[in-house]
Amino acid sequence: MTKSELIAALAARYPQLAARDTDYAVKTMLDAMTQALASGQRIEIRGFGSFSLSQRSPRVGRNPKSGEQVLVPGKQVPHFKAGKELRERVDLAGGLADTQPDGDAPDQPQPTLLGLHAM
């Protein structure tokens, strides 16, 4: 799912919100998360997961064109660890896909990640 698809899905799910408001909310949230990680902060969303930074050590790489060895400097990279509730929901969804050959969603409303039923 792309950012545009996420915005469209949220706008469709919550028609009381204007599409531009949904767009603004998603972009603002992603910007805040990016700024927090860039400043070295850890982000934890209970039930969903946590974002943190991992340090990659410097290493010796190879230029694929010339075969020459080059030093690749160390750097910090974002890391995501899924929360227990997200892992369970993904596992459950995988099991549902195996039992429903037509791929249709179940007839009952499925709870969202926070336990609320989708509108």
Curated annotation (Swiss-Prot):
BP GO annotations: DNA recombination; regulation of DNA-templated transcription; regulation of translation
Highest rank taxon of the organism: Bacteria
Pfam families membership: Bac_DNA_binding (PF00216)
CDD domains (UniProt xref): IHF_B (cd13836)
SUPFAM superfamilies for this protein: IHF-like DNA-binding proteins (SSF47729)
GO molecular function list: DNA binding; structural constituent of chromatin
Gene Ontology CC annotation, any one: cytosol
The entry's keywords: DNA recombination, DNA-binding, Transcription, Transcription regulation, Translation regulation
Region (Disordered): 93-119
Extent of Low complexity compositional bias: 97-112
Function according to Swiss-Prot or TrEMBL: This protein is one of the two subunits of integration host factor, a specific DNA-binding protein that functions in genetic recombination as well as in transcriptional and translational control.
Alphabetical list of NCBIfam families matching this protein: hip, PRK00199.1
Quaternary organization: Heterodimer of an alpha and a beta chain.
Record-stated family: Belongs to the bacterial histone-like protein family.
Protein name as catalogued: Integration host factor subunit beta
Naturally occurring in which organism (per UniProt): Bordetella petrii (strain ATCC BAA-461 / DSM 12804 / CCUG 43448)
Lineage: Bacteria, Pseudomonadati, Pseudomonadota, Betaproteobacteria, Burkholderiales
